[in-house]
Amino acid sequence: MKNTPEVKASPQTGYRIPGYLLVVYALLLFTLGWFGHQRWADISPIPLSTSAAAIAAPPTKVGMVPASTAVTADENHPGSLHAAAENSATQTAASGSQTSASSQEATPDTKPAKLVTGWQTAKPGELPYIAFSAHVYTSAPDKRSVTLNGERYREGDSPYQGLVIEQIEQDMVIFSFNGEPFILDSLQDWPGGKPGDDAAQGNEQEPTSKPEQTVRTTKK
């Protein structure tokens, strides 16, 4: 053992990386990692926003097919699909016609009832009820007018069969009914009946103040 020669290790002759290169490599790795993180951050929000929009969107209503109109097919009978489709179309058309008919029947009920206005029909030789609501008298005959049963008339007009407005005076209106003169005081309603009949004249009411009546008298 004492005679064994000592083996001397030779010094290492390998390449050693300088310190500044290590710093450069570290900076490159950090830069690549930072760019990769930014790239991933730009791409990843797209599916997240899409999923969030899908979650926030209201669910779409899907029309439910009634069991009575469902179309079924039998594997052993290929023609059953066509027959079932025809039955479904027939039932759908029948239900649509019933719905439209029911809506048409319900429509007249929703309309308000119209008030009966204008001239009523009287017996032959008699006049119906006349509501005298307005009387306009001026010195110009073409500007004189009266409102009977909600309609405006002038001298010479015939508001009812056989009745003619002959002249509009300041406090009365002169009519002719079937050729007979007939006088009605201003704003005096006619209760109906035959002109000149004492019963009809006795049923006349006293003039009452009406908010809608307008009486205008002008003189030059």
Curated annotation (Swiss-Prot):
Disulfide bonds: none annotated. The chain crosses the membrane at residues 17-37. It holds the Pfam family T2SSB. It is a single-pass membrane protein. Residues 202-220 have a biased composition (Polar residues). GO terms for biological process: protein processing. Residues 85-114, 188-220 are annotated as: Disordered. Keywords: Cell inner membrane, Cell membrane, Membrane, Transmembrane, Transmembrane helix, Transport. One of its GO terms (cellular component) is type II protein secretion system complex. The keyword Membrane applies. InterPro entries: GspB_C (IPR032389). It comes from the Bacteria. The keyword Cell inner membrane applies. Residues 85-107 have a biased composition (Low complexity). It is found in: Cell inner membrane. Out proteins are required for the translocation of pectate lyases and cellulases across the outer membrane. Belongs to the ExeB/OutB/PulB family. NCBIfam families: T2SS_GspB. This is General secretion pathway protein B. It comes from Dickeya dadantii (strain 3937) (Erwinia chrysanthemi (strain 3937)). The gene is outB.
